[in-house]
From Swiss-Prot:
Sorted UniProt keywords: Cytoplasm, Hydrolase, RNA-binding, tRNA-binding
Name this protein carries in UniProt: D-aminoacyl-tRNA deacylase
Record localization: Cytoplasm
UniProt subunit comment: Homodimer.
Transmembrane feature ranges: none
């Protein structure tokens, strides 16, 4: 399971010219599901995302996690993160989870984060989305479990 996280000062997702999810300070999470992923990996990754210290403390050091910084999550499904780009000039998605598997783990990821008390907005699984963000830093990390 893969989460490309970006520290943002604001981010939003638009589907059919309608904003369906938006946050101010927090993390934009692009979430990719691979075939071997399961609930255990999902919980481990969600915990890591929420606990990862990417926000600056009073000394300007990246030392605060999402909750400590008072941030929110915007979680967007992103199957292309599971692409194999090692050969040729076209990505292979043979390692990506099935749509059913990915939808289930995506929904569980969101529910798990919300259950921890984190304000969590979402995109729309499988939709053509327009994601707008202001990357703060920029700060971007690729987390995998």
């Amino acid at each position: 399971m893969i989460a490309l996280i970006q520290r943002v000062s604001r981010a939003s997702v638009v589907v059919d010219n309608q904003t369906i999810g938006a946050i101010d300070k927090g993390l934009l999470v692009l979430l990719g599901v691979e075939r071997e992923d399961n609930r255990e990996k999902m919980e481990k990754l969600a915990t890591k995302v929420m606990s990862y210290r990417v926000f600056s403390d009073e000394n300007g050091k990246m030392n605060l996690n999402l909750t400590q910084a008072g941030g929110s999550l915007l979680v967007v499904s992103q199957f292309t993160l599971a692409a194999d780009t090692g050969r040729g000039l076209r990505p292979s998605f043979s390692g990506a989870g099935t749509p059913e598997q990915a939808l289930g783990l995506y929904e569980e990821f969101v529910a798990f984060c919300r259950a921890q008390g984190v304000t969590t907005e979402t995109g729309q699984f499988g939709a053509d989305m327009k994601v707008e963000l202001v990357n703060d830093g920029p700060v971007t990390f690729n987390l995998q479990v």
